[in-house]
Curated annotation (Swiss-Prot):
GO biological process: circulatory system development; D-glucose transmembrane transport
InterPro entries xrefs: MFS_dom, MFS_sugar_transport-like, MFS_Sugar_Transporter, MFS_trans_sf, Sugar/inositol_transpt, Sugar_transporter_CS
Pfam families per the UniProt record, alphabetical: Sugar_tr
Cytoplasmic topological domain: 1-48, 106-119, 163-176, 223-282, 343-349, 492-502, 554-621
Entry GO terms, CC: endomembrane system; perinuclear region of cytoplasm; plasma membrane
Spans through the membrane: 49-69, 85-105, 120-140, 142-162, 177-197, 202-222, 283-303, 322-342, 350-370, 471-491, 503-523, 533-553
Organism of derivation: Macaca fascicularis (Crab-eating macaque)
Protein name: Solute carrier family 2, facilitated glucose transporter member 12
GO MF annotation terms: transmembrane transporter activity
Main subcellular localisation: membrane
UniProt superkingdom: Eukaryota
Family: Belongs to the major facilitator superfamily. Sugar transporter (TC 2.A.1.1) family. Glucose transporter subfamily.
Function: Insulin-independent facilitative glucose transporter.
Length: 621
């Protein structure tokens, strides 16, 4: 899914100095959270929701190209490589913004960055609507890419810094939820405008009003209090905290923020590549994890869903767009329980389950596609039939009838059909004589649409077509509970607070870069080896990601950030992790199970878990 910088802001769980004293004081009074951490009123919630609208815009822009490409490639007669560039140009802009976005956000503020990204998205969408050439289309997509990358970082940082401690995870997760809702909205839009003349313009234009409204609303929201402290405006920060927490005195939280900012200056960017606190191992774990997020193929399913579904039997634009809408529905349904249950199940467990199910569904998809006798090597070219090409050339040609003239349109369809029936016999004689004006006209139409023979949709068994769609939906669901949201949670936990933001920026750039490479070559690779073998390659990558997660990713459930950092700081962390897994499994699975009372089983489980934790955290290791 989309990379977001899940910056925790001030670590309120276990800070040094003042933070520890504050924690002890409120626990001594019997309260679970300090007063300033409990303040999550309606204003804080509405501010978070307003900022999270950026996620909706990001998801919409990521998903809308799936259906718009079906119309644009015919209108502009795009080649395979040009279609890949239309899709990937957004990622080029996102990659550029990820390299500089952190500096812009720290200099001008999180709120200002969100306002700027919303305005830029509206401008880019306007360029797309008015674009009449391939070059202008690329420029508009790059502008939107810059916008969504900047907003992805700024939104999560802003929400994390205005949210109270015990609601930070929930409020930050609103952005991820809004992203998948945006993807679903894009697929619905694809279906709604699939058969509308110039429907792609409506698809691109729907987000403009929402972007403008968000920019206006964000203008009236307060800046991040953490950003104000960074700029030396402690008085303004205190007022903002009082408004967000509904407290008259926010001195304690302000002290914690200042303390955490001092800790951040202990690390430099280059410490990520040094052995200090085993940071080199941590960044390699992070970079490899985001590599598997992209190399398992999910971005291609997101961008090319309608194209892939069209190649496996959903022949019309409307049918392919409707089927891809199911992808958006599944993403939303799967993301909600993953977000709610991650604190109880654990991110590593979700990653393992997701990778396993992804591999199984991809194998099924590949086998099914092998049995669908279609020309997979032409997936990237236009699949319009000669009938559709002639109809569109008569009805929708420049200066001809509009889509609203139904009576005349039906009349001219009859003329097109008559012309088509008279031209089809001539097509068979082109190779023999090649001397008819009508045959020349037909050849011009054929070259314009890159026509090739495609198997009749009726030749594809309905069972195989729907099994392919079902496998795709299972694959999307598995990604949405595993490699979609969980890597960004893991990345926010394995780095110390003082360097977490820079580590997230680096992994975010890696994520966009690999996404660009994969999306830029998907149609070309599919054109060379076929869709089934692409699925099998993704299967191997999913299994490799499962092995990597099992061996290298720590289970952070129930651990404080300091405990996680302490374990990862060990030089021989990887060796200890593998050995711990084998010993822990031997102890938890007795050779001769015996029936015992539930109380005895609970005591034994607590005993084994206690031994496992002591082994993991012992100084000897």
């Amino acid at each position: 899914m989309v990379p977001v910088e899940n910056t925790e802001g001030p670590n309120l769980l276990n800070q040094k100095g003042t933070a520890v004293e504050t924690e002890g004081s409120y626990r001594a009074s019997g309260s679970r959270h300090p007063p300033w951490a409990r303040g999550c009123g309606m204003f804080t919630f509405l501010s978070s929701v307003t900022a999270a609208v950026s996620g909706l815009l990001v998801g919409y822009e990521l998903g809308i190209i799936s259906g718009a490409l079906l119309q644009i490639k015919t209108l502009l007669t795009l080649s395979c490589h040009e279609q890949e560039m239309v899709v990937s140009s957004l990622l080029i802009g996102a990659l550029l913004a990820s390299l500089t976005g952190g500096v812009l956000i720290d200099r001008y503020g999180r709120r200002t960055a969100i306002i700027l990204s919303s305005c830029l998205l509206g401008l880019g969408s306007l360029v797309l609507i008015l674009s009449l050439s391939y070059t202008v289309l690329i420029v508009g997509r790059i502008a939107i890419g810059v916008s969504i990358s900047l907003s992805s970082i700024a939104t999560c940082v802003y929400i994390a810094e205005i949210a109270p401690q015990h609601r930070r995870g929930l409020l930050v997760s609103l952005n991820e939820l809004m992203i998948v809702i945006g993807i679903l909205s894009a697929y619905i839009s694809n279906y709604a405008f699939a058969n509308v003349f110039h429907g792609w313009k409506y698809m691109f234009g729907l987000v403009i009003p929402l972007g403008i409204l968000q920019a206006i609303a964000m203008y009236f929201l307060p800046p991040s209090p953490r950003f104000l402290v960074m700029k030396g405006q402690e008085g303004a920060a205190s007022k903002v905290l009082g408004r967000l927490r509904a407290l008259s005195d926010a001195t304690e939280e302000l002290t914690v923020i200042k303390s955490s900012l001092k800790d951040e200056y202990q690390y430099s960017f280059w410490d990520l590549f040094r052995s200090k606190d085993n940071m080199r191992t941590r960044i390699m774990i992070g970079l490899t994890l985001v590599f598997f997020v992209q190399i398992t193929g999910q971005p291609n399913i997101l961008f090319y869903a309608s194209t892939v579904l069209k190649s496996v039997g959903f022949q019309s634009n409307e049918a392919a767009s409707l089927a891809s809408t199911g992808v958006g529905v599944v993403k939303v349904i799967s993301t909600i329980p993953a977000t709610l249950l991650v604190d109880h199940v654990g991110s590593k467990t979700f990653l393992c389950i997701g990778s396993s199910v992804m591999a199984a569904s991809l194998v099924t998809m590949g086998i099914v596609n092998l049995n669908i006798h279609m020309n997979f090597t032409n997936i990237c070219r236009s699949h319009n039939s000669i009938n559709q090409s002639l109809d569109e050339s008569v009805i929708y040609g420049p200066g001809n009838l509009s889509a609203s003239n139904n009576t005349l349109r039906d009349h001219f369809k009859g003329i097109a059909s008559h012309s088509r029936s008279s031209l089809m016999p001539l097509r068979n004689d082109v190779d023999k004589r090649g001397e008819t004006t009508s045959a020349s006209l037909l050849n011009a139409v054929l070259s314009h649409t890159e026509y090739q023979i495609v198997t009749d949709p009726g030749d594809v068994p309905a069972f195989l077509k729907w099994l392919s769609l079902a496998s795709l939906l299972v694959y999307v669901a598995a990604f949405s509970i595993g490699l979609g949201p969980m890597p960004w949670l893991v990345l926010s936990e394995i780095f110390p607070g003082g360097i977490r933001g820079r580590a997230m920026a680096l992994t975010s750039s890696m994520n966009w870069g690999i996404n660009l490479l994969i999306s830029l070559t998907f149609l070309t690779v599919t054109d060379l080896i076929g869709l089934p073998w692409v699925c099998f390659i993704y299967t191997i990558m999913s299994l490799a990601s499962l092995l990597f997660v099992v061996m290298f990713i720590p289970e952070t459930k129930g651990c404080s950030l300091e405990q996680i950092s302490m374990e990862l700081a060990k030089v021989n962390y990887v060796k200890n992790n593998i050995c711990f897994m084998s010993h822990h499994q031997e102890e938890l699975v007795p050779r001769q199970p015996q029936k015992r009372k539930p109380q005895e089983q609970l005591l034994e489980c607590n005993k084994l878990c206690g031994r496992g934790q002591s082994r993991q955290l012992s100084p000897e290791n």
